[in-house]
Amino acid sequence: MGKIWRISGPLVIGEDMKGAQVYEIVEIGTQRLVGEVIGLEEDKAIIQVHEDTLELKVGEAIRGTGAILTAELGPGIVGSIYDGLQKSLTVLMEQGSFIERGARVFPLPRDKKWPFTPKVKVGDRVSQGDIIGTVPETHLLEHRIMVPVGMKGIIKKIAEGNYTIEEPVAQIEVDGKVKEITMLQKWPVRKPRPYKQRFAPSKLLVTGMRILDYMFPLALGGKAAIPGGFGTGKTVALQQLARWAQTQLNIYVGCGERGNEMADVLYSFRQLKEPTTGRLLQEKEVFIANTSNMPVVAREASVFVGITLAEYFRDMGYDVLLVADSTSRWAEAMREIGGRLEEIPGEEGFPAYLGSRLSSFYERAGRVECLGSPGREGSVTVAGAVSPPGADFSEPVTQNTLRIVDAFYALDTSLANKRHFPAINWLTSYSLYVD
């Protein structure tokens, strides 16, 4: 498609890029590093690279893929550990202790067979969102196979059996043509998944933290922020939410935080048991680890991959909790990219579009009526940590987040210094979900 014209850290500008589209995935250099087109000007393209650009040279080739950043959806997600681009870290670990640049692995296992049980029969008319079968993904969660968005027709073939995610489990006649349905679906991470209607948040989400459930309740499908200075317990508070919240699935996104904290999360969740069934808590968790030493650009991808996975399970009729630690690190990545693009900075150097980017993430939370039959409701609840420097809540990330969320759990440095945990200041915090 083109070649490298300029390199500035994680930012690459390519020339001779006519035909490229915004948010298209490209492969850069001899190692075929993954990049994403974020801007176009005449025949030049601005590309943010999701991997380390060390040893890249001006003049190396840039190859277009014609595809945009998508998440793979299907059996095998629950219990997995991904990086910000949904590469399976479990598979990458088998290749060595360090992640090689340009490494390519599938997010979902291609050779594993899953027992598929049909819920419809030949001759039934189905449309987008209809549940056509189920797969027992873990002991705690049943994976419901749905008709892909935009497809409807009559079932021509469906059978019980063991299938891989790429083998067709059903055939549908659409306008005289037969199309196959597999258990594997793909969805653009920046595009919200559709639903029938959205409900006002009215049902309580039991978080398992008494101060929240009693004084500052969080609703199913709600949005919450947990801001606090260094050492006030943001990560521990989010971990407690992910452990004990009464939801069917929890997604933990470690976005730009310390690697040892993520290692502690992974270790502890493999030991803890779900209180109602006694099964391991890992059987209802998904982990996305994008630590502070990983490429900064992938921080944005990690939160959008996480919310896309959450919406997918919401469409099955499940209540999903997504915790993001921390959205401030994502905002810092936006500030770094904005600086390298020589954009006019906003307050404290953050880009002027900081608020709209945060909104595009938080506003995908909600309790909805799902597409298809049988009729069902699902929800995505989002809780994000904010790390204001010096515990200054007047800084831009906290203030922009405050405009979006309906529950605000302010962590107090003085309480944390007294070893009062969770260090939630009951005078500053509030919840708009209280009647």
Please report, for each region that a protein language model flagged, where it lies by residue.
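Metallocofactor- and cofactor-centric catalytic cores in central/energy metabolism, strongly enriched
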Residues: 42-45, 67, 151-155, 227, ...
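Short, compositionally biased
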Residues: 39-44, 75-86, 141-162, 180-194
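Short, structured beta-strand/loop micro-motifs enriched in basic residues and often containing a Trp
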Residues: 5-12, 40-48, 106-117, 148-154, ...
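P-loop NTPase nucleotide-binding/switch module
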Residues: 94-148, 164-222, 237-240, 275-294, ...
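N-terminal accessory targeting/assembly segments
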Residues: 1-93, 97-100
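Short, surface-exposed secondary-structure boundary micro-motifs
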Residues: 17, 31, 67-68, 86, ...
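Hydrophobic beta-strand signal
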Residues: 27, 62-64, 127, 133, ...
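P-loop NTPase catalytic core
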Residues: 214-215, 221-435
